[in-house]
């Protein structure tokens, strides 16, 4: 049970049938890994801190530049030249002093990435390049950790949630009959198999409108709160949500599992071999 102070602070979301007091308790115990502290990570982290998520790990090796302030709304003028993880952690603690924040100001190698993903209840991919997204996808698939990914460029944004079948305690407390969890779901590599060495357009070249970045980060926060509080994504998993900021319109595309995917098919085969060896 929550004490009176916590109940009062989070009463507006506790009042939601889908969350309630037990869902809020889950949020307070949750461990979230946010990789990338730019526009997406800013928006998502602020709302997760406000919602009462207990423990957040921030990963980014970059520093705040003046051009970031157009869309990375947690940062202020005084943060220019500071590490993004430190500046964002400072803002999150001002919003929620009880939040436990750990910062990592370097790129994670494969071993460290897998460790951090294993420790997390959910991962938010807020990065801006395909190779890193593929590594995060692989780690989340390996550890069966839910992944919420988003991106934005120009006036367009995209969002997708992958539920790889969590082994974490928060989900175990909930009804595991969720229809959004697939036994063998598609992964990010199924969606973008060509992306490892692809040349990607940068925001500095193509431009980006700030509110679109914020919207995608907010979608990541919404999906994360759903999963942590209720044990399931209420939104349809494994569907690519596309947003057009010029027409203010949404489109949804189903992601089909690639039977030749070298990431999730290999992982499935390895899991099968482990099962048969026991």
PLM feature segments, named:
Residues 1-278:
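Adenine nucleotide-associated cytosolic modules
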